[in-house]
UniProtKB/Swiss-Prot annotation:
Coiled coil: none annotated. Keywords: Cytoplasm, DNA damage, DNA recombination, DNA repair, DNA-binding. GO terms for cellular component: cytoplasm; Holliday junction helicase complex; Holliday junction resolvase complex. This is Holliday junction branch migration complex subunit RuvA. It comes from the Bacteria. It comes from Thermomicrobium roseum (strain ATCC 27502 / DSM 5159 / P-2). Belongs to the RuvA family. The keyword Repeat does not apply. Residues 136-139 are annotated as: Flexible linker. GO terms for molecular function: ATP binding; four-way junction DNA binding; four-way junction helicase activity.
Amino acid sequence: MIRGVRGTLVAKRSGEVLVDVQGVTFRVQTSATTLQELGEPGDLVSLVTHLIVREDELALYGFATEAELELFLSLLAVSGVGPRGALNLLSLAAPDRLTEWIRGERIEELARAPGIGKKTASRIVLELRGRLPALTEVQAGEPIDQELVAALQALGYTAQEARQAATHPEVRRAPSLEERIVAALRQLAPP
């Protein structure tokens, strides 16, 4: 329903951010990983989101990357894992590391998340081990083009926006820095 939020970061708190989108302020629950990716209040931020509708509330969950959102949705599909537990897991480590832990059946690592015991961690491994999508090159730890990120930041984009654009496949394929900048600007341009 609400697939993304792009606006001015109003406040960062433990587990949530407030984002002003043209006069409407959204409270978006996030993982610690996403909180670290976001800038400071006043910066323009962009989050991919998932809206959960309950009888008594609407809860918006936001993530810095599509990979983090996909892993969040996969974790929600596991019996006994709710949104809070999924966020706690995503706060432990980056999505690629969590995926490695699940595939490697590292139950002790998963059980370190608040609210996730060994029994739930075992269930996560059992249900997701073979279902998680393959990691992309960037998720697997390929370095981000820091020169491109710095150039985009010099043009006024936030660190988060610059990193997201730098990881786009079209941008990564461009041979020279100038061509990567042009490709990144195409990705960052409003639709």
